[in-house]
Amino acid sequence: MNIGSILKYYRMRNDLTQAELCKGICSISHLSKIESNKTIPRTETINELFQRMGIDWEREVATYDDWKEKVESFVMHSVYYDLKSMEEVYIELSTQEDYLQSTDLVNRYELYKLRYYLFKRDMPRATQQTSILRRMESSFTDYEKGVSKVIYLMYDIFSQNFTEAENRLQRIEQYRERIPMLFEGELFYQKAYLLHNRAQYGRSTYFAEMAVDHFLKDCNYIRLLHAQLLLAINYTNRDFTMQADNLFKTILRNAKIMGMDELYQGALYNYSVLQNRRGLHKSAYEMLCELKALLEPGTDYYQAILIHLLHTASEGNIEMDSLIEELDAITKRKEDPYLMTLLTYFRKMKISQQELSDFCEQTAFPFFIKHGYIGEARSIAWKLANYHRSIGNDGKADTYSLYYYEKGDDQ
């Protein structure tokens, strides 16, 4: 512990000058060295200085040990993703920030505050916290430097600054031996997530498997589920259907047992994607219906699931009139061109193949390309390629097929 910093904290709190505090005990220059942690004073000197301020030094040591234990619990709750407990400890620690600033606990506390803000999705405070940490970096220990590399990487990814995240990851790999073992699983997970975002599903699978293995050995069961979900999504994108199917079933069961509602919902959605890829549209439809019932109407996520339900219903020849009516109500309220295009698309499905294909070719496909809706554009390109090939128009079929594959997943 930094005795001098704590001594200075209490001196300032008691509104004492250095001369007033050290009179008859030691020289002002010696007190200055103590307060700047340049020298370790004798026990007698420490006791006399604290007694002058009415503080029992032994009790102060016990107080320090208590706060050290709380900071360590804050760290462990963060590592093991116990967000409720982390928030409880954060509230307690935040009432003693002035004291913590005077101790050698401050770096670790401030580092994990950034991770706490990321978990809370409080990006303004997270951004502010990164600025604070930059100013503190010169005082970081090697361990704290290793921790900071991973937490900064998380910040870049949460901020969707993926280019900077990739650059940071390259720098991290140059100092791999300096990443604490406790953070290796997190580093593997973040790297897998970043590679997945870049559609490099093969490499992402490799690091997701490493994250799963690390979290399993570390008994980090909540983070294990997160890594398993990412792994199952990668398996889906690589058409490893049996591995993905088994993993999704495990994730859904464990997420439900553990009361992890958000993760359960994410697993439901991604399992439905797998089922649609396998042609099991009825199963996918049932999963999406279950998910939709869990969501708050009016949210962006609810809207996205409604659209996926419509796509699934159309693929599985499932009645979708009520879903179209619901999308119509949302479209009228929002007056969003994207939703208007989708609404017309689903309505044309119920009229004729020719009218649907004309609308897709003349309106929907150009609109989705222009506004960057690549997933929707690829879906329509695939349908148009099949349509033109069925009527012998191979030239157009090849054009749409080329777009579909060029914009496809880099597996």
What are these regions (language model features)?
Residues 78-92, 118-132, 157-171, 199-210, ...:
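Helix-turn-helix repeat elements of alpha-solenoid scaffolds
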Residues 1, 8, 337-411:
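C-terminal non-catalytic interaction modules
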Residues 54-70:
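Short C-terminal boundary/hinge segments that cap the last helix of small helical domains
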Residues 42-59:
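DNA major-groove recognition helix of helix-turn-helix/homeodomain DNA-binding modules
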Residues 69-80, 108-120, 146-161, 183-199, ...:
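Tandem amphipathic alpha-helical repeat scaffolds
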Residues 14-33:
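Short alpha-helical DNA-recognition segment
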Residues 101-106, 140-149, 179-189, 218-228, ...:
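Alpha-solenoid helical repeat architecture
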Residues 90-98, 130-138, 169-180, 209-220, ...:
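Amphipathic alpha-helical segments of tetratricopeptide repeats
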